[in-house]
């Protein structure tokens, strides 16, 4: 017969291919699929593969003008999720040709663009992505990475210390700069703009940049250490964001900051390129991540957002604290912390890692632990995150009864004590409290902090 067979057909005829052998160049995705009652899992998995690649709801004559076999996504494996009713992990392979080189934006538009609103699915969550080396090589990645950052800052063998300046909204630029100076002077490596400090009526960005630069230079002169403040360059337009980054470079400061999810991947990648070309480090905040990753059965796991950030570019990214959370959470968090830092990560389902990932020497990203932590947590943080991390104590610095500088001193003393104890072979997990107590005997600032936040 002439023509083609019109009409609606089952996706699984075309897009469910359990005998498919994945290629090294395929982008692989693991989706957690919750089909509507009565929808077989194979059909649901095939729908996801179709709608995120070449498929549409009915047969179209223009299908004959291309080779579907070459361009279609394929659902190649489905497994039920243990302990969950009617929930499956569907593995989908996408041919590399479907994606624009060096564009996280395009990768996400394809893989998670349309398919999450599908009627046949009750819920859908992207759990992990395997980025093939051929695609990774089209990205610049982090502007500098862990090693270059250490060399720029001349700080080795320990985690870095930071602090978010509070109250986050309402301070004038001069008072803000003063708070920055005191923290850096006391012994922190970095201070940080809050994610929502951009350029508001009470503190315009240029004034803040100037006073923070003054604080940095003064603290550097007094301590003999290199200091930084994450100047938030996030803005309403891409041009304005770059304008702020240019001004930071002209001031000679070491690092700027971006909210990569609210600012968007396109803006983030542009900023990362600018930062590499101009020697600026780039700190990334993940504001809005919980909108995407909080639900267990729908959205995207943070490890996917973390992988995307490593491709798009950033030298630091917030990654949760682990401390005081559930034990299982700890393994999962450490899984994506390794995905950020290491060059090669083996598949390990107990840590939430669905695919072996080879980053082909793309620079690593420093994970930032931030939120509700204080000096008593220092041994655990040092043990869990190791040297390649940034530990950020906002309230844990500024909440010190004697002020910011003593708060910074307390944190630095606690950190140095933990690192020294670890290097001497002591067990931080078991002896942590004892190590902090010993150190507080010769540091009144630490003793006062220990008293305020005793558990």
From Swiss-Prot:
Kindly list the positions at which N6,N6,N6-trimethyllysine occurs in this protein.
Answer: 5
EC number of the protein: 4.1.1.39
Top-rank taxon: Eukaryota
Source organism per entry reads Tamarindus indica
**One GO term of the cellular component aspect?**
chloroplast
Localization per Swiss-Prot or TrEMBL: Plastid, Chloroplast
Query: What name goes with this protein?
Result: Ribulose bisphosphate carboxylase large chain
The UniProt family comment states: Belongs to the RuBisCO large chain family. Type I subfamily.
């Amino acid at each position: 017969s002439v023509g083609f067979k019109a009409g609606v057909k089952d996706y699984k005829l075309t897009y469910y291919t359990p005998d498919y052998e994945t290629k090294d160049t395929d982008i692989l995705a693991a989706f957690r699929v919750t089909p509507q009652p009565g929808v077989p899992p194979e059909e649901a998995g095939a729908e996801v593969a179709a709608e995120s690649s070449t498929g549409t709801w009915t047969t179209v004559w223009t299908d004959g003008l291309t080779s579907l076999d070459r361009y279609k996504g394929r659902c190649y494996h489905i497994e039920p999720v243990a302990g969950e009713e009617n929930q499956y992990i569907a593995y989908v392979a996408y041919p590399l040709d479907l994606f624009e080189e060096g564009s996280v934006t395009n990768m996400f538009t394809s893989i998670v663009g349309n398919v999450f609103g599908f009627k046949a699915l009750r819920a859908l969550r992207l759990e992990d992505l395997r980025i093939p080396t051929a695609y990774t090589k089209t990205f610049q990645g982090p502007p500098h990475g862990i090693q270059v950052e250490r060399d720029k800052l001349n700080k080795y063998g320990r985690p870095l210390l930071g602090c978010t300046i509070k109250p986050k909204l309402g301070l004038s630029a001069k008072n803000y700069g003063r708070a920055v100076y005191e923290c850096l002077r006391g012994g922190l490596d970095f201070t940080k703009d809050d994610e929502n400090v951009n350029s508001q009526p009470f503190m315009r960005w240029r004034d803040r940049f100037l006073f923070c630069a003054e604080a940095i230079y003064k603290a550097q002169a007094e301590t003999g250490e290199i200091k930084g403040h994450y100047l938030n360059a996030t803005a309403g337009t891409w041009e304005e964001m770059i304008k702020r980054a240019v001004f930071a470079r002209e001031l000679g400061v070491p690092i700027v900051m971006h909210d990569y999810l609210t600012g968007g991947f396109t803006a983030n990648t542009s900023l990362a390129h600018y930062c590499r070309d101009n020697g600026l480090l780039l700190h990334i905040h993940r504001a809005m991540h919980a909108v995407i990753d909080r639900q267990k059965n729908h959205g995207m796991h943070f490890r996917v957002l973390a992988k995307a950030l490593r491709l798009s570019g950033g030298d630091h990214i917030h990654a949760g604290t682990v401390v005081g959370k559930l034990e299982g959470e700890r393994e999962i968090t450490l899984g994506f912390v390794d995905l950020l830092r290491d060059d090669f990560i083996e598949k390990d389902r107990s840590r939430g890692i669905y695919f072996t990932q080879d980053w082909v020497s793309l620079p690593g990203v420093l994970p930032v632990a931030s939120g509700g932590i204080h000096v008593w947590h220092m041994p655990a943080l040092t043990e869990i995150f190791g040297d390649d991390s940034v530990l950020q104590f906002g309230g844990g610095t500024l909440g010190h009864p004697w002020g910011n500088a003593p708060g910074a001193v307390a944190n630095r003393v606690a950190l140095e004590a933990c690192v020294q104890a670890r290097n001497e072979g002591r067990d931080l997990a078991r002896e942590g409290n004892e190590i902090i107590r010993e150190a507080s005997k010769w540091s009144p600032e630490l003793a006062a902090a220990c008293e305020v936040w005793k558990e």
